[in-house]
Amino acid sequence: MVKKVLLINGPNLNLLGTREPEKYGTTSLSDIEQAAIEQAKLKKNDSEVLTFQSNTEGFIIDRIHEAKRQGVGFVVINAGAYTHTSVGIRDALLGTAIPFIEVHITNVHQREPFRHQSYLSDKAVAVICGLGVYGYTAAIEYALNY
């Protein structure tokens, strides 16, 4: 079982709770992060969830590199718009060889065509999209039991 999971959120996800609530709901990123941390504590086996959010691609890449040094065993990532553009984030995930799940709050396949392409999906253990913020709960649960 994985003891340390890193939850990464990319650009504009810091606006959750206020950004387009008809699409993303009213749950804040802070609420999502706190729920993930509590979910790990409920395991009562010293599991932990670390959280990180950045609007900057390079900072996300640096955090993935740091995760390897910290002994993170699984990454749950909502790369936001970088999902559709970032070879750098893909390469960081592959370079560290940390297994990961890609999460999206909305069903990206029901949205604009440019959102249908993911640079991460083909390398992810799983992709969860369209389940709202519950997608994070499902991904964290899987990661903690990996």
From Swiss-Prot:
Residues noted as binding substrate in the record, renumbered to the chain: 78, 84, 91, 105-106, 115
Organism: Candida dubliniensis (strain CD36 / ATCC MYA-646 / CBS 7987 / NCPF 3949 / NRRL Y-17841)
Pathway, per record: Aromatic compound metabolism; 3,4-dihydroxybenzoate biosynthesis; 3,4-dihydroxybenzoate from 3-dehydroquinate: step 1/2
Subunit structure: Homododecamer. Adopts a ring-like structure, composed of an arrangement of two hexameric rings stacked on top of one another.
Transition state stabilizer, annotated site positions: 19
InterPro entries per record: DHquinase_II (IPR001874), DHquinase_II_CS (IPR018509), DHquinase_II_sf (IPR036441)
Catalytic activity line of the entry: 3-dehydroquinate = 3-dehydroshikimate + H2O
Domain of life (superkingdom): Eukaryota
Catalytic center residues: 24, 104
Keywords: Lyase, Quinate metabolism
Cited function: Is involved in the catabolism of quinate. Allows the utilization of quinate as carbon source via the beta-ketoadipate pathway.
NCBIfam families: aroQ (TIGR01088), PRK05395.1-1 (NF003804), PRK05395.1-2 (NF003805), PRK05395.1-3 (NF003806), PRK05395.1-4 (NF003807)
SUPFAM superfamilies: Type II 3-dehydroquinate dehydratase (SSF52304)
Keyword Transferase attached: no
Protein name in UniProt: Catabolic 3-dehydroquinase
Gene3D superfamilies the record matches: Dehydroquinase, class II
GO terms for biological process, alphabetical: 3,4-dihydroxybenzoate biosynthetic process; quinate catabolic process
Gene Ontology molecular functions: 3-dehydroquinate dehydratase activity
Pfam family, one: DHquinase_II
The EC number(s) this enzyme carries: 4.2.1.10
